[in-house]
């Protein structure tokens, strides 16, 4: 009995506790990411943004949470009630479940599986089903058109993201996210005789793929300038037209969880994860999770600045960019990187 408890029960309890702790921390982080998004946009437009609830508006997201929770959900007449309510739940659960394999620091991961990046790519591909379900179950043409646009957009840019990931995997030789970060201890900088620093990270040696991944991440998460499925001037509010209260909150939560995931993936694949920018003793004292969080926040700041400055694309421009520019460019980079690795004997 004791061996059964120590072998199965206790590890399960620890994993559940870790999952709950990560979930709570992630939800709080998303609340402040949402606030930061509004604050940055307001600052660019010379406004103050949310500043009433709490000091500097720090509790605005929690006030919005209470507002959504206590509002009555309204289901349209003729809608498929079960699918209508299931769609936002599917979206948010899939978006949150991907974080189980994301290493926040060395050893700070719930499931350190050897196919971590493949797991994230597979789960992220399933998120489009929640959007399609929500648009179809609303029994309205505008949400359905918005859902179709969103599905086409996400599928289009997943191909480019997949090729970018393949390029990184060719350089690292592993699907494990921790191995991808550790492989960035040495890189282009050390080959040139420089000390270990941010010049070794993949953003420099794979710079074209870094740009493609960043722009594709914007499109994958329906962020501006690729927010066509939700653009007020395009299709009212996309697939979320008929949603309100808690179901709408779940869609927003899933969207920002996916945005945070893309920031974390950019950090892991190209910005060295939890590695300090320069390998010196004083920076190595800083916990890895601090470096990881700072890098992810920097990537999100870039997301927010793109939202503030770049005008929205037309739908045909969006599709042309994905299929006629990013797809051939990323495919060519895969071939070039594989050729260089084989030629130099690094494969």
UniProtKB/Swiss-Prot annotation:
Say which enzyme class the record assigns.
Answer: translocase
Subcellular location per the Swiss-Prot or TrEMBL entry: Cell inner membrane
Checking Pfam families in the record gives: NADHdh
The protein's topology relative to the membrane is:
Multi-pass membrane protein
Enzyme Commission number(s) of this protein: 7.1.1.-
Give the record's GO CC terms. Answer: plasma membrane
Q: Which PROSITE patterns match?
A: COMPLEX1_ND1_2
Quaternary structure per UniProt? NDH-1 is composed of 14 different subunits. Subunits NuoA, H, J, K, L, M, N constitute the membrane sector of the complex.
Q: What family is reported?
A: Belongs to the complex I subunit 1 family.
Q: What is this protein called?
A: NADH-quinone oxidoreductase subunit H
Q: Which species is this UniProt entry from?
A: Rhizobium johnstonii (strain DSM 114642 / LMG 32736 / 3841) (Rhizobium leguminosarum bv. viciae)
**Gene symbol of the encoding locus:** nuoH
